[in-house]
């Protein structure tokens, strides 16, 4: 990609081949299903750096063995579980309020069916406790993950000539657990924020309870941040990360 200046003076990324019809044709003629390597080019570094965002998709997954990740260590491909239909993906992360295919969900049970445990008691637990709650006890085992961002403070990044918000990292993080039915409440920019019982604003709050028959106990990465709020409207103030990276100020 190249950085180009738009008519209004702002800068934007532009594919190198956009003004090269022959190269664009070649790209169009060499489309194939994405491999793990292709998926990881974006998802490993989402959120600003390696393993920053989710904490469970790390650089080490590229050459993982079965002890590190039983699926990728068995040479499975991402798209075997994260399936697509007409370029729409099945399922969504817990931080997403919208879904391409709301009626379809990616679940462990899509492959793992029938009696799965030596003890029937464990299978009964599976009706209310999701698989990853027990089978993935920690995350960020290789690369540290972003657990808190303070946008009121900016720190210079050594050797890069830019700033970024103050970030607290952790490794070998134990998830937090709560009931979830697959839906949640998300904070929107055009609505006043809602302060929860813990005194904090929930950017995404999972829906579900013990009394909800559709809910199970899931493991979550609990990320916190310090964000600006308009004291008059009670709304979140959108952050333009470009100026923050350049000046260290919101």
Regions found by a protein language model. Name each.
Residues 1-250:
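C-type cytochrome heme-c attachment and multiheme electron-transfer modules
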């Amino acid at each position: 990609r190249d950085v180009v200046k738009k008519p209004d003076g702002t800068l934007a990324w532009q594919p190198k081949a956009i003004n090269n019809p022959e190269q664009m044709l070649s790209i169009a003629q060499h489309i194939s299903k994405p491999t793990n390597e292709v998926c990881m080019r974006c998802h490993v570094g989402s959120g600003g750096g390696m393993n920053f965002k989710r904490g469970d998709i790390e650089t080490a997954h590229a050459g993982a063995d079965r002890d590190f990740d039983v699926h990728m260590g068995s040479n499975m491909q991402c798209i075997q579980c994260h399936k697509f239909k007409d370029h729409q993906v099945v399922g969504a992360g817990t931080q997403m309020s919208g879904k391409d295919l709301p009626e379809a969900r990616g679940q462990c049970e899509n492959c793992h069916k029938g009696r799965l445990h030596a003890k029937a008691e464990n299978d009964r637990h599976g009706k209310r406790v999701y698989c990853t709650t027990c089978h993935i006890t920690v995350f960020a085992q290789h690369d540290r993950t972003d657990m808190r961002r303070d946008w009121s403070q900016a720190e210079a990044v050594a050797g890069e000539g830019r700033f970024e918000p103050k970030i607290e990292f952790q490794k070998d993080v134990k998830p937090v657990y709560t009931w979830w039915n697959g839906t949640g409440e998300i904070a929107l920019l055009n609505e006043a924020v809602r302060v929860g019982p813990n005194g904090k604003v929930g950017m995404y709050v999972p829906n579900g309870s013990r009394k909800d028959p559709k809910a199970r106990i899931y493991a979550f990465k609990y990320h916190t941040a310090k964000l600006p709020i308009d004291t008059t409207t009670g709304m979140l103030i959108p952050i333009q990360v470009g100026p923050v990276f350049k000046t260290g100020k919101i």
